[in-house]
């Protein structure tokens, strides 16, 4: 492999892809980022059994090829480079990174396999990214941190025609957000359960100036894919039965009040000063 890259684009792509790598991976392969040079692009991919990431940038490819290197180390190295151009060359089990006066040699694996992303019939045309991010932030409010109950750590996503309903609960709170999308199959009716922490991580990494595309197998979903600005994230779905909470959401509420958010938060904070930890506050 012999590739010429723009340093800024290379560093950004490596940083985004390597974010899914665990701090202490159980398998050395899971500590790596796969680089593949082909047809004028340099492709990046990483995986951690729960979420995968794929990205690509334009590059000058003199020799096609692929290699697996330590992702976090590669991210630190590329972030420190200051030259406009960076060159990547493989020679056997070594990746050489050259950028002006800097030359770094990294141990590499030539044989590797990083799982791909979700592919299915339920994917949609691009949707507005800010709308999706807002829905994720609202729906994840009530996600539980109890790892011994995996179902409560997830957000249920119900795809019903052009509507997506996101719900979470930790047994004490409920959160729900709804947004519209444009599915390729207008009659799609599928429910998925995705880990809330992964969903928030995906939302944080999105480019909100670009649209987002969701992808899954509508008949038997096991993965949920998110594509945005050339970046693809895939999340493993949680296998379990989400609590029946729909009846707790009323279609109409007889009493409604519109208040200033900060005023409400300030009032609650003052009252909570004299309340015991986790004690309820009457409103």
Could you describe each region identified by the protein language model?
Residues 1-283:
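Structural preference for solvent-exposed beta-strand-turn elements
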